[in-house]
Amino acid sequence: MPAPRAPRALAAAAPASGKAKLTHPGKAILAGGLAGGIEICITFPTEYVKTQLQLDERSHPPRYRGIGDCVRQTVRSHGVLGLYRGLSSLLYGSIPKAAVRFGMFEFLSNHMRDAQGRLDSTRGLLCGLGAGVAEAVVVVCPMETIKVKFIHDQTSPNPKYRGFFHGVREIVREQGLKGTYQGLTATVLKQGSNQAIRFFVMTSLRNWYRGDNPNKPMNPLITGVFGAIAGAASVFGNTPLDVIKTRMQGLEAHKYRNTWDCGLQILKKEGLKAFYKGTVPRLGRVCLDVAIVFVIYDEVVKLLNKVWKTD
């Protein structure tokens, strides 16, 4: 006589007691790099506007009256493609940045999960912090320094950099490798807090959505919404650090003795509001940025799980 079947409700609940599936760091590196490259091609114009507004210091007569005026002046002077000036430097950095970030996050989280393979919010924050520090030191600081110098140079009356690689050669020739690591402290603080906030929020929302089933599938729409929320939280949490980082990496960084001096000078000469200059364009870019990255990352990991067996 055949054994009776388990009730449907119990069968459906079975996965809840299973162990959460882990993501191999190698998969995370590939998926993260692809996601980072696609995302930056979509969102770069808002990054360009944000950087222009932050470099438009109050100590000089303002060049732009706001976001719209910055876009109008750029398009009038250089055409629509002017909003993509400096894209190459950011694109070259975005792919390895996302690869390092997700690879490090998965590496750390795989060692910090509980016996069931679950990651709580606090550990998600710590893993995000580690991922942010890693991407800051390995990729973000040198690439962001070059990007800001390149954009700043292109808006000067007589640009001296003919392209990305020429700009890198000139910066290294004139300032040495140290010239590509300006604002390292601010960058580590910014990226560390950035990813700590994002992964804390993302981990919290995912745990809430999945409940007792850590392997519950998430469709791209849900992932995108959660990513946008995480992005918004990070913007309001560390925009002042982003402003300081941008100033420390600009062509006039020599005006500041160090990161702390930069912050004090901005506060003294321009007031507290200067720390939130460029917040609106950054908010739109980051929300879209984080949503796109997490959606593409998750979907690529799903694909890799089918063709790359690591269990």
UniProtKB/Swiss-Prot annotation:
Q: From what superkingdom does this record's organism come?
A: Eukaryota
The reply on keyword Lyase is: no
Q: What keywords are annotated for this sequence in UniProt?
A: Antiport, Congenital myasthenic syndrome, Disease variant, Membrane, Mitochondrion, Mitochondrion inner membrane, Phosphoprotein, Repeat, Transmembrane, Transmembrane helix, Transport
- GO CC term (a single one): mitochondrial membrane
Catalytic reactions on record: (S)-malate(in) + citrate(out) = (S)-malate(out) + citrate(in); D-threo-isocitrate(in) + citrate(out) = D-threo-isocitrate(out) + citrate(in); citrate(out) + succinate(in) = citrate(in) + succinate(out); cis-aconitate(in) + citrate(out) = cis-aconitate(out) + citrate(in)
Q: How is it modified after translation?
A: Possesses a short cleavable presequence, which, however, is found to be dispensable both for targeting to mitochondria and insertion into the inner membrane. However, the presequence is required to keep SLC25A1 in a soluble state and thus in an import-competent state. Mature SLC25A1 lacking the presequence is prone to aggregation.
Indicate where the modification Phosphoserine is found in the sequence.
Answer: 156
Q: Which InterPro entries match?
A: Mit_carrier, Mitochondrial_sb/sol_carrier, Mt_carrier_dom_sf, TXTP-like
Query: How the protein is affected by changing residue 144 to Q?
Result: In D2L2AD; abolishes citrate transport
Membrane topology for this entry? Multi-pass membrane protein
What's the effect of swapping residue 47 to K?
Answer: In D2L2AD; severely reduced rates of citrate transport
Per UniProt, subcellular location reads as: Mitochondrion inner membrane
**What sections of the protein cross the membrane?**
29-46, 86-105, 129-143, 183-202, 224-241, 278-297
List, alphabetically, the PROSITE patterns matched. SOLCAR
Q: Which Pfam families match?
A: Mito_carr (PF00153)
Stated consequence of mutating residue 262 to R: In D2L2AD; reduced rates of citrate transport
One GO term of the biological process aspect: monoatomic ion transport
Q: Identify the PANTHER family for this entry.
A: SUCCINATE/FUMARATE MITOCHONDRIAL TRANSPORTER-RELATED (PTHR45788), TRICARBOXYLATE TRANSPORT PROTEIN, MITOCHONDRIAL (PTHR45788:SF4)
| Family under the similarity heading | Belongs to the mitochondrial carrier (TC 2.A.29) family.
State the function annotated in the UniProt record.
Mitochondrial electroneutral antiporter that exports citrate from the mitochondria into the cytosol in exchange for malate. Also able to mediate the exchange of citrate for isocitrate, phosphoenolpyruvate, cis-aconitate and to a lesser extent trans-aconitate, maleate and succinate. In the cytoplasm, citrate plays important roles in fatty acid and sterol synthesis, regulation of glycolysis, protein acetylation, and other physiopathological processes.
Q: What is this protein called?
A: Tricarboxylate transport protein, mitochondrial
What organism does the record attribute this protein to?
Homo sapiens
